[in-house]
Amino acid sequence: MKVTLIAILTCAAVLVLHTTAAEELEESQLMEVGMPDTELAAVDEERLFECSFSCEIEKEGDKPCKKKKCKGGWKCKFNMCVKV
C-alpha cells in the first residue's frame, strides 16, 4: 500500500513539474527579449503582403504611399500591416 501511495504521489509531482515547465516554455516563446509591448506584436503574412502590394501600386513618384485601410484591427504603416 505504501508503494502505491508513493507511486501516485511521484506521478502527481512529475505531472505538476512537467505542466509548470511547459507553461514557462510557452511564456518564454511568446515574449521577445528587448521588444516593448507597443512595438509590432504580430504580423499576419497575408495582410502584410496585401498591404505592401497595395501601397506599391498606389505610390506615385515622390508622393508618400496612400494608406490602405487594413481590416480587423490592422493598419498600414511603413508599407506593412501592423496590429493596432
From Swiss-Prot:
Expressed by the venom gland. InterPro entries: Hwtx-2-like. One of its GO terms (cellular component) is extracellular region. GO terms for molecular function: toxin activity. Pfam families: Toxin_20. Disulfide bonds join C51-C65, C55-C76, C70-C81. Blocks neuromuscular transmission. Acts cooperatively to potentiate the activity of huwentoxin-I. Paralyzes locusts and kills mice following intracerebroventricular injection. Belongs to the neurotoxin 12 (Hwtx-2) family. 02 (Hwtx-2) subfamily. This is U1-theraphotoxin-Hs1a.
